[in-house]
């Protein structure tokens, strides 16, 4: 049984001391890494599965940031937050454009160099238009060049959507990476996968093929058409444009994963109904969660 949870505000520090449910927090600014901010964070007496989502100002795969002092300090800052809150999980967005994609392995190495003893989660983002065009113009066949992931790519004898093939190649960069100091996982975001050219059936196929490589899913709907910048909405709601979104919700429930719903235009009751209908568990209602 998968569990539905949400983004949590950090405004009420005391909640960290009592909330043992999994959830996601999103520090939005680099100033959060100042010692004064860290001193305000409580130190819970228990370990928890809090996913610390990095801000967009930290771009560890960018030519302008990879390896420089500001980027490295930010990476270390997320480690300090994780240590204080007694969680292992830190999320960074993977490359969203061609230049960053060419830095993928170097960026992973730099993250691994600057953070210690954590579970680093690389989220597949919505790709830029130029990146989508690049994938379209450079289609790849089912990749078998990564021995650690051959079974993943051999699981279907049918020709696949070229965007699906590329996404497998993209994810294999993470799953085949050999870290020294951390564990590395992926994070699949259903809204981003829709933006990148997948329908609901292909999304579930991907979830199943990489089942052993992630603990968290971002389970979001998308009000935009494919190949457009994503805007989240509750999955399988009236405005969600993911094709076969009901199939996605029905099948993710069976994966035993932590599903973070990153929306602001829904309500707890919608997700509660989703949980009851499809067999999820759901965290208790909390005024600090965004729905």
Language model: regions and residue ranges:
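C-terminal helical cap(s) of enzyme catalytic domains, especially alpha/beta-barrels
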Residues: 268-291
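Hydrophobic faces of well-ordered beta-strands that scaffold small-molecule active sites
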Residues: 1-8, 23-25, 50-54, 90-92, ...
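Gly/Pro-rich active-site loop or hairpin
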Residues: 61-69, 194-258, 264-265
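A structural motif
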Residues: 20, 84-87, 117, 214, ...
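N-terminal pre-domain/capping segments
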Residues: 1-79, 83, 181-183, 285-291
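Acidic-and-aromatic substrate-binding clefts and catalytic sites of carbohydrate-active enzymes
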Residues: 9-14, 25-40, 57-71, 96-102, ...
């Amino acid at each position: 049984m998968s569990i539905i949870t949400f983004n949590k505000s950090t405004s009420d520090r005391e909640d960290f001391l009592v909330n043992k449910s999994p959830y996601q927090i999103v520090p939005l600014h680099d100033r959060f890494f100042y010692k004064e901010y860290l001193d305000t964070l409580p130190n819970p007496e228990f370990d928890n599965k809090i996913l610390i989502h990095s801000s967009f100002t930290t771009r560890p795969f960018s030519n302008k940031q990879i390896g420089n002092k500001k980027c490295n300090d930010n990476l270390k800052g997320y480690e300090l937050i994780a240590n204080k809150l007694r969680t292992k999980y830190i999320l960074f967005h993977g490359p969203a454009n061609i230049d960053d994609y060419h830095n993928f392995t170097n960026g992973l190495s730099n993250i691994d160099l600057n953070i210690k003893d954590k579970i680093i989660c690389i989220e597949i983002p919505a790709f830029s238009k130029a990146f989508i065009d690049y994938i379209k113009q450079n289609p790849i066949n089912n990749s078998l060049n990564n021995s650690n992931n051959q079974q993943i790519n051999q699981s279907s004898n049918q020709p696949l959507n070229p965007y699906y093939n590329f996404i497998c190649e993209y994810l294999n960069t993470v799953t085949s990476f050999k870290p020294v100091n951390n564990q590395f996982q992926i994070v699949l975001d259903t809204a981003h996968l829709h933006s990148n050219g997948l329908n609901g059936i292909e999304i579930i196929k991907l979830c199943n093929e990489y089942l052993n490589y992630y603990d968290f899913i971002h389970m979001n709907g998308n009000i935009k058409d494919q190949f457009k910048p994503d805007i989240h909405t509750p999955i399988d709601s009236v405005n969600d444009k993911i094709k076969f979104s009901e199939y996605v919700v029905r099948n993710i429930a069976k994966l035993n994963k932590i599903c973070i719903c990153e929306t602001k235009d829904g309500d707890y009751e919608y997700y509660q109904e989703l949980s009851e209908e499809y067999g999820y568990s759901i965290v208790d209602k909390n005024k600090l969660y965004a729905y």
